[in-house]
């Protein structure tokens, strides 16, 4: 087993005004097989590595193996000092911190939150409710209108700012439409409890069917409408139903009083 650290130079030093950057490549070789720490953590790699709870030290080796796309058996063959060094590098690359919102990613543009379709809104809400980390590829694909196979290769830093931004924006939408989402007793969107994912999907399916007037053939038409237009109607419709229920209850109570 051998550990190799390579400092790579990007750019052309023969030109005085050229842009030159450096990056460190860390790799090790076991049985003629070389494994490298990637220059950046891709969206796909992040989704696979985030499942390891790093509070448990037993998960450090599989975490590093995931980052380096190496078998766990290779981790077991590393000297403790080498493993500790590689682990530190991987953890450093995995730290995201506060990232700016990128308007472009791999040739695709970030969608406008205020003009997204109802379909995009529903899909984002569903995936975020199920967990950002577990659905980061799907969320990023919607945000940038990119195919999954494209966006999963993007550096996680390039899309993380937009993911956090849409999550905060979603919370504001919930507060704005608290009558529809029934947030009177809650502070904002909640993580789904056991069976909650199915409830969220059912809630949106019922909402879509209400917009389509229970006509399956109209579903595509209504989900392509602006999200705000859809929520405005759904909020009004819900208020009308509640008003009707109150009127029916009042009529029932009046009838009971008259028959006594």
Model regions: which residues?
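An amphipathic, hydrophobic-aromatic interaction surface with interspersed Lys/Arg
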Residues: 2-256, 260
């Amino acid at each position: 087993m051998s550990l190799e650290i390579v400092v790579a130079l990007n750019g052309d030093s023969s030109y005085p005004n050229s842009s030159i950057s450096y990056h460190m490549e860390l790799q090790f070789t076991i049985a003629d097989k070389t494994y490298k720490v990637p220059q950046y953590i891709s969206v796909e790699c992040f989704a696979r590595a985030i499942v390891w709870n790093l509070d448990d030290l037993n998960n450090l080796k599989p975490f590093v193996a995931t980052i380096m796309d190496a078998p766990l058996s290779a981790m077991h063959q590393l000297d403790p000092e080498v493993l500790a060094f590689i682990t530190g590098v991987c953890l450093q690359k995995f730290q995201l911190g506060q990232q700016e919102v990128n308007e472009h990613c791999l040739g695709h543009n970030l969608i406008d939150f205020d003009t997204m379709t109802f379909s995009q809104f529903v899909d984002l809400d569903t995936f975020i409710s199920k967990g950002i980390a577990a659905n980061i590829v799907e969320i990023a694909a919607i945000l940038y209108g990119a195919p999954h196979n494209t966006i999963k290769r993007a550096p996680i830093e390039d899309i993380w700012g937009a993911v956090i931004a849409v999550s905060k924006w979603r919370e504001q939408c919930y507060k704005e439409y608290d009558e529809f989402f029934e947030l009177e007793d809650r502070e904002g969107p909640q993580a789904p409890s056991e069976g909650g994912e199915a409830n969220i999907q059912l809630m949106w399916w019922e909402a879509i069917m209400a917009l389509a007037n229970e006509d399956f053939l109209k579903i595509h038409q209504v989900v392509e409408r602006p999200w705000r237009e859809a929520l405005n109607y759904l909020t009004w419709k819900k208020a009308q139903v509640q008003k009707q229920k109150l009127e029916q209850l009042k009529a029932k109570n009046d009838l009971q009083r008259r028959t006594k």
